[in-house]
Amino acid sequence: ANSKTVKNEEKQLNRLKGKKVTYLVQNEKYSFTTNQIITRATYQSGKYHFDTTALNKQIKKINEKHATLDKPFKFKTHSGAEITTTANGSYGWKISEKKAGNSLTKAIIDGRQEVDGKYDIEGKGYNTAGLGYNVTSNNGIGDTYAEVSLADQRAYFYKDGKCVLETDIVSGTNNEGNKTPKGVWYIMYQQSPSVLRGQNDDGSSYASKVNYWSPFTLTGCGFHDASWRHNWSKTAYLSDGSH
């Protein structure tokens, strides 16, 4: 018990006691002590090993207040109606419990007194880094976005708070396999030109050339032109919508 190794391990662990770290999330400060961050710590072969389970409840509370991932958004539509979106969708961010644990324990080791939570966010879908942390306008959605009304089969494209384009659309055919999902999503990437590939309802394959492709789901929903389409009626999507 008196070996140099054990004494050094004890010394390194004692270094961590009684520390305080301020965690900054969207300009709000949260103060954590060593005991609130670290449930258990060991020091072996020159490295610390931490269990930060103690922190998880606090991060959950922070996410309940600040995070936007998997939450509904309050939104004013083009028509002026105030709605609440479904919690479905890929857009948003939250603090990762694992990342927060790593950054806060590192701060304790390094003797730093403040950590910025923006480096600990995560998201889902194509971009797992999370989106919208610095966006506070329009209830977290921002002022540049595309709004799609499935009821009106109409799309409105906003840039810096101004509608710069509105157009008729035909959404996915209104069945379980093809209907356009509700919620707030982010554009994953953009391709021009592109080829859309998939299967028709009869099982045959298709490959459609388009000039513009901006997908927003991993299952193939997105914005694109459709030179082959002749039926642009408001009810086309009910039985003759997009794939």
Regions from the language model: what does each represent?
Residues A1-S208, Y212, R229:
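Surface-exposed, secretory/extracytoplasmic low-complexity segments enriched in Ser/Thr/Asn/Gly/Pro
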Residues Y212-F216, G220-H243:
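Active-site scaffold segments
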